[in-house]
Amino acid sequence: MYEQAIVIRNDLKMGKGKMAAQACHASIQAFLHAQKISSSAVSGWMNEGQKKVVLKVNSEKELLEIFKNVNIEGLPCSLIRDAGRTQIEPGSLTAVGIGPEKEEKISKVKKDLKLL
């Protein structure tokens, strides 16, 4: 089974629409990265219904730690930096997208995170 995980910073107090937009940015960018490095995972994920899970962290430090661990594992990923046109400061790190990849690989880096 394949999945994609999206990790959102909860401490920024973004509105629901803003969080949804940041999650979409993270999902698309991670997907594009996955197409380059893991086409078999992308195909599997597409054929299985494109499962996604959205998780939260409470600080930029936690988000960067997740991003570092994802890179150590060699998973396709994205780190989203907001342009700052609406609710938050320009350059704020808002989200990380992980995968698509096999669930067991993503589980290594998301194991302690709570659902958004």
From Swiss-Prot:
Record keyword Hydrolase present: yes
Superkingdom to which the source organism belongs: Archaea
General function of this protein: The natural substrate for this enzyme may be peptidyl-tRNAs which drop off the ribosome during protein synthesis.
Residues annotated as signal peptide: none
Lineage of the organism: Archaea, Methanobacteriati, Methanobacteriota, Methanomada group, Methanococci
Protein's name in the database: Peptidyl-tRNA hydrolase
GO BP term, pick one: translation
Organism per entry: Methanococcus maripaludis (strain DSM 14266 / JCM 13030 / NBRC 101832 / S2 / LL)
Catalytic activity: an N-acyl-L-alpha-aminoacyl-tRNA + H2O = an N-acyl-L-amino acid + a tRNA + H(+)
Family of this protein: Belongs to the PTH2 family.
